[in-house]
């Protein structure tokens, strides 16, 4: 099957500065894929290149098999982008904005388009704002309109560039519920976010960028297991026996932390503590965390 997004040996230079250093990746149709990295890693440059807004210095980019340069109309038609910045035309209502956006892709006005716009407005809780001027909306409402704009031409591939930056919890939950529906319906989702828990919960595969390069790329589960460990936290009444000091990784008050690779090690560690004379009053197991993985990868 043709990849939804294909990036082959992409480089982008601004004079002596290298923004993208030979990036290659392939995202399958129907994937929910995260692209993570610190500010300046090259994520937005890569997205701009996919959208045809930035010409790369070398390499090829394709969306649903369409080259973003030689077949740019088809590539752009297959792509819907929710930008990081809130950009809007202050002279039009929400409904007018969506109609104009659809027109840019050659979609004629009519019952079919209006029905789809009404469905988008309902899904994004914008129905009561449909005829309001864009400048009258709150920041969160404007961001919902950006999502609707990205979807109004029904693209199979959707790019979300920091879609929940600066929005409240209610909007975040509403947006992710809708995006999950889109992914379940077969849409390919490419997400960039600094909320790593979102990427961990939503995405099946993750790539991490640093200084214009991909420094890690794998399934979410494999990344969590490769770069992070479960932690057994044990609360002990009294001092930790000296024989257990050297295997403890950290102490927080009365809680002692021990790294474990899998759950089968829990009873082994507890038995060793009891045998050494430790009086255990409480315990918990912390699962691997994407934030820890991210920090470990960036510090390598």
List each language-model region with its residue ranges.
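Conserved ABC transporter NBD signature motif
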Residues: 59-70, 74-75
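Conserved ABC ATPase "signature" region
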Residues: 99, 103-106, 111-129
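Conserved ABC ATPase signature
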Residues: 133-137
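A short, proline-enriched helix->beta-strand linker immediately N-terminal to the Walker B motif
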Residues: 152-156
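Catalytic Walker B motif of ABC-type/P-loop ATPase nucleotide-binding domains
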Residues: 158-161
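ABC transporter nucleotide-binding domain
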Residues: 176-260
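Short, charged/small-residue-rich alpha-helical element at the C-terminal edge
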Residues: 229-300
């Amino acid at each position: 099957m043709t990849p939804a997004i294909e990036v082959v040996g992409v480089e982008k230079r601004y004079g002596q500065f290298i923004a993208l250093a030979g990036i290659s990746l392939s995202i399958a149709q129907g994937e929910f894929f995260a692209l993570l990295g610190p500010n300046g890693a090259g994520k937005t440059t890569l997205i701009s290149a996919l959208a045809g807004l930035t010409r790369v210095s070398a390499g090829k980019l394709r969306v649903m098999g369409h080259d973003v340069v030689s077949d740019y109309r088809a590539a752009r038609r297959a792509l819907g982008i929710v930008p990081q910045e809130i950009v809007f035309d202050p002279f039009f209502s929400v409904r007018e904005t969506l109609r104009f956006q659809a027109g840019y892709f050659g979609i004629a006005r009519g019952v079919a388009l209006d029905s789809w716009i009404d469905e988008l407005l309902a899904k994004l809780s914008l129905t009561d704002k449909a005829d309001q001027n864009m400048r009258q909306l709150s920041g969160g409402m404007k961001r919902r309109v950006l999502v609707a704009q990205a979807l109004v031409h029904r693209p199979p591939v959707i790019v979300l560039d920091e879609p929940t930056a600066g929005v409240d919890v209610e909007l975040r939950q509403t947006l992710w519920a809708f995006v999950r529906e889109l992914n379940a319906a077969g849409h390919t989702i490419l997400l960039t976010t600094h909320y790593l828990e979102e990427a961990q919960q939503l995405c099946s595969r993750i790539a991490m960028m640093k200084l214009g390069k991909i420094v890690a790329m794998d399934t979410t589960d494999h990344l969590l297991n490769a770069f992070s460990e479960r932690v057994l936290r044990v609360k002990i009444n009294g001092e930790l026996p000296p024989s257990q000091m050297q295997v403890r990784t950290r102490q927080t008050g009365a809680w002692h932390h021990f790294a474990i690779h899998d759950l089968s090690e829990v009873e082994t560690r507890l038995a060793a503590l009891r045998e050494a004379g430790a009086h255990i009053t409480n315990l918990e197991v912390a699962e691997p965390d994407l934030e820890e993985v991210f920090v470990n990868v960036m510090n390598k």
